[in-house]
Regions:
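Generic alpha-helical scaffold signal
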Residues: 12, 37-41, 56
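Short, hydrophobic secondary-structure boundary micro-motifs
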Residues: 29-31, 59, 177-178
Length: 205
């Protein structure tokens, strides 16, 4: 299967897109952090802060896989700890509706997993998501992440409380998944759909 997206450093031309996404309350409704609308100046500062190499974090623009390489979202790693060899998967945002229901999020996760375990040679990759997110818990399950803990009723959205689900993967688990070919996109989608079906069965009971 041909990748639908590619990855690059942030550029000045991405500011308008970031400004739009950072002010889209619906897009940000199911992220762990609280919604904070951006001024255009804040969007400029944010993009420039994401550019280049940094000791403790790394951001990539998720782009169309063509000559234009137009930004459609972003993905990042934070809290890079080279002593304890661990890193936080800070999240994925796909702001372009045309790519939100495709494989872009899986491709972005595979890319950052490879970067964390192979390029940075780290031991542990961890992250979190809200229990009410329609995609993230099932995607992390499909990718082979382990649920390590639940912070109950930790975030309030529209007068409803959601748990924060904490996930992690170790380097030996990642390499085992790679060796068995379980990061194949088609296999991931099958496990993703299966996870959704199981959650619906549990909810209905």
């Amino acid at each position: 299967m041909v990748n639908t997206v590619t990855f690059r450093d942030f550029e000045e031309r991405d500011i308008d897109f970031i400004y739009k996404c950072k002010n889209d309350e619906k897009l940000n409704s199911m992220v762990v952090g609280n919604f904070h609308p951006f001024t255009y100046e804040e969007a400029e500062k944010w993009v420039r802060g994401c550019m280049g190499e940094h000791e403790t974090y790394k951001f990539w623009a998720v782009c169309t896989n063509d000559e234009e390489r137009r930004i459609i979202g972003w993905v990042s790693l934070s809290n890079i700890d080279r002593i304890n060899r661990c890193v936080c998967h800070h999240g994925i945002v796909i702001g372009d509706n045309d790519y939100r229901d495709g494989t872009a999020m899986f491709e972005a996760m595979i890319f950052t997993m490879e970067y964390a375990f192979n390029s940075l040679n780290l031991h542990r990759l961890y992250g979190s998501c809200l229990s009410g997110h329609k995609v993230s818990p099932h995607m992390l399950n499909a990718l082979g992440f382990n649920l390590e803990g639940v912070q109950r009723d930790a975030v309030c959205r529209n007068e409803k409380y959601y748990d924060i689900l904490n996930y992690a993967m170790l380097e030996e688990e990642y390499h085992s998944i790679v060796e068995t070919g379980d990061l194949d996109i088609e296999k991931l989608i099958m496990r993703f759909v299966s996870s959704i079906k199981k959650s619906k069965v549990i909810t209905n009971h």
